[in-house]
């Protein structure tokens, strides 16, 4: 337990927020470069901040810290992204503001295989074939993020 009213707690909170701002700035830079390469402009920017903590108020007015590990904010009307995998689509969603989920939604399809097991069992040629069959060119990522380690996003979203 880390008390955010202590010096250490305040330092942690500031550091975590700086890391979040850094990640967001990097995503904006990636999006800007993609838009430039495609000679277009984004119609909207949707953040998918996850594995992060926020100060929020519950329905009863209690202020709490919500840490969303594997989840993303989904307050009423808030736009979000639920990614699939390297070979499946992602979904742009609008939050329902469901209090029983603390205004949160899944950050993705969910794993069916751990990172360590994926690194031990999936080969690079196997990954390349799966992606080639889907017409996907890999420019980043590793075996622990291979499409076969995730649930089918279409089933998850239905």
Model regions and ranges:
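Domain-length cofactor-binding catalytic modules of enzymes
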Residues: 1-158
């Amino acid at each position: 337990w880390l008390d955010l009213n202590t010096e250490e707690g305040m330092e942690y909170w500031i550091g975590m927020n700086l890391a979040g701002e850094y990640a967001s700035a990097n995503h904006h830079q990636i999006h800007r470069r993609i838009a430039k390469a495609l000679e277009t402009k984004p119609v909207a920017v949707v953040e998918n901040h996850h594995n992060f903590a926020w100060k929020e108020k519950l329905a009863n007015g209690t202020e709490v810290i919500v840490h969303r590990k594997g989840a993303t904010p989904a307050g009423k009307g808030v736009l979000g992204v639920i990614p699939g995998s390297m070979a499946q689509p992602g979904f742009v969603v609008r939050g329902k503001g469901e209090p029983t989920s603390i205004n949160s939604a899944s950050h993705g399809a969910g794993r069916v295989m751990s990172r360590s097991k994926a690194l031990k069992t999936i080969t690079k040629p196997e990954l390349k074939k799966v992606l080639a069959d889907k017409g996907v060119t890999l420019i980043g990522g590793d075996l622990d993020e291979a499409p076969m380690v995730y649930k089918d996003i279409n089933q998850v979203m239905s």
